[in-house]
Amino acid sequence: MLVLAHTGRESARRSARQVIERLTAAGIAVRVTDAEVPDLQCPGATVVPAGPEAAKGAELVIVLGGDGTLLRAAELARPAGTPLIGVNLGHVGFLAEAEPEGLSRTVDHLVAGEYRVEERMTLDVTARENGTEIVSTWALNEVTVEKAARERMVEVVIEVDGRPLSRWGCDGVVCATPTGSTAYAFSAGGPVVWPEVEALLIVPIAAHALFARPMVVSPRSVVAVELLHAAVGAHNQAGDGAGDGEPGAAEVERAVLWCDGRRRFDLPPGARVEVRRGALPVLLARVHGLASAPPGGGEFTDRLVAKFGLPVTGWRGRPAR
């Protein structure tokens, strides 16, 4: 098993050492990356390069940290087809399976092989300039096309399956998976989508338009975001004429592409970004609800209630059938 941790936190380093000691005591081979060895100081682990081969052949990747650490781990686990399991040492930690107080119990399940694996939909992303591919990447949570300058909007046209849908002057556009519906898309006003639902979400960010609502489309759809060439200063939000006499339209319509808030790519004016269902899913290991989870996404419902502190007082239970 490969163990990854947010080594900038003492709690994560301490938990990682605890996990490694318990796994090695159970006779399970453990890997850590060379980037984390100085911080973890675990002599019982095998050191591997912190690259795309780190998770190859591993049974699991155990991640100790927040959602950001798990997203980093997903970049290693996805190409290897290795499941991830997260222990939340961050804030919300929506992707994590366990909290710190349940760490020992979670490790016991893993040692005994008592876990199930879920597939989570991903996104494949390409960006082109004048028909030439300039970016090819992927995301687990979301892809965002955002303005590069705080004082300016971007002008975009949204296309779904080869047909134009709407033109927006906006701060950006989020294209998200169901897994990402509780992340940036949620903060931008998008709906929460249960992970069993197969869909793509399109969520505008602060759009100046009458029709600018979050939309849910087929998982087979291809969503395109095209950056338009607009007039100089056409979207000076301050309204003070600051756009007068400034450089050309390239500055006005320059934008950035973010994938999972981790990988950033500059987009030139006129760029086209296409988002579709990813060819490879991310695999998440689960130890909760192995036999007792109610049908219809009950485990996810409980996770929503716990993570967001939703009020459920007055619920009288499921009626007898």
Predicted regions span which residues?
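Short glycine/serine/threonine-rich phosphate/pyrophosphate-binding segments
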Residues: 12-13, 68-73, 181-187
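ATP/nucleoside-binding phosphotransfer catalytic cores, i.e., glycine-rich phosphate-binding loops
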Residues: 145, 161-164, 213-321
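Short glycine-rich anion-binding loops that position phosphate/pyrophosphate groups of nucleotides
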Residues: 8, 67-69, 92, 179
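Gly/Ser/Thr-rich active-site loops/lids in small-molecule metabolic enzymes
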Residues: 163, 167-212, 216
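Short, acidic/small-residue loops that bind anionic groups at enzyme active sites
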Residues: 80-98
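Proline-centered loop/turn at the N-terminus of a beta-strand
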Residues: 29, 81-83, 201
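ATP/NTP phosphate-donor binding region
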Residues: 1-60, 101-116, 127-137
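Catalytic core of DAGKc-family lipid kinases
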Residues: 92-172
